Amino acid sequence: MHLYTYLYLLVPLVTFHLILGTGTLDDGGALTERRSADATALKAEPVLLQKSAARSTDDNGKDRLTQMKRILKQRGNKARGEEELQENQELIREKSNGKR
């Protein structure tokens, strides 16, 4: 029973000691120093992008976002322009007339 009392007191003390990082590793380095060095080595470097480099461009080197804004403005912020709608309606009429 006396042994269990010592273990009961020793286990939380050792655990607390390791959590705080005051324990040492086999090579003599402190636990927290080793972990912080590893974390620093693995930390990703921030990537700074210029505004133009962050946007995708088409084959001609033009900015796709700017082109889409321009196209939507011309269409009146509709998904399809008037010409495309008329062409689609004509195709639907032709197909429906062909089935009869």
Curated annotation (Swiss-Prot):
Q: Which residues form the signal peptide?
A: 1-21
Arranged from A to Z, the UniProt key words for this protein are:
Amidation, Calcium, Cleavage on pair of basic residues, Gamma-carboxyglutamic acid, Ion channel impairing toxin, Ionotropic glutamate receptor inhibitor, Magnesium, Metal-binding, Neurotoxin, Pharmaceutical, Postsynaptic neurotoxin, Secreted, Signal, Toxin
List, as start-end ranges, the regions of compositional bias called Basic and acidic residues.
Answer: 56-66, 90-100
Q: Where is the site Important for selectivity?
A: L85
- Residue ranges, annotated region (Gamma-carboxylation recognition sequence that plays a role in the conversion of Glu to carboxy-Glu (Gla)): 61-80
Co-factor: note: Divalent cations stabilize the toxin the in alpha-helix conformation.
**Pro-sequence residue ranges:** 22-80
Query: What's a single GO CC term here?
Result: host cell postsynaptic membrane
Found, by tissue, as follows: Expressed by the venom duct.
The annotated region (Disordered) lies at 52-100
Compartments where located = Secreted
Molecular function, one GO term: ion channel regulator activity
Asparagine amide-modified residues are N97
PROSITE patterns assigned:
CONANTOKIN
Q: What is the effect of changing L85Y?
A: Little loss of inhibition of NR1a/NR2B receptor; 70% of inhibition of NR1a/NR2A receptor
Instruction: Give me the residues that bind a divalent metal cation, please.
Output: E83, E87, E90, E94
What is its cofactor? Answer: Ca(2+); Mg(2+)
Residues with PTM 4-carboxyglutamate = E83, E84, E87, E90, E94
Q: What is the effect of changing L85V?
A: No loss of inhibition of NR1a/NR2B receptor; no inhibition of NR1a/NR2A receptor (as for the wild-type)
The consequence of L85I is:
No loss of inhibition of NR1a/NR2B receptor; no inhibition of NR1a/NR2A receptor (as for the wild-type)
Any other comment in the entry?
Answer: The mutant Gln-89 consists of the addition of a proline residue which is hydroxylated (4-hydroxyproline). The mature peptide does not contain cysteine residue.
Q: Which family does it belong to?
A: Belongs to the conotoxin B superfamily.
What the protein does comes down to: Conantokins inhibit N-methyl-D-aspartate (NMDA) receptors. This toxin is selective for the NR2B/GRIN2B subunit. Induces sleep-like symptoms in young mice and hyperactivity in older mice.
Q: What is this protein called?
A: Conantokin-G
Q: Which organism is it from?
A: Conus geographus
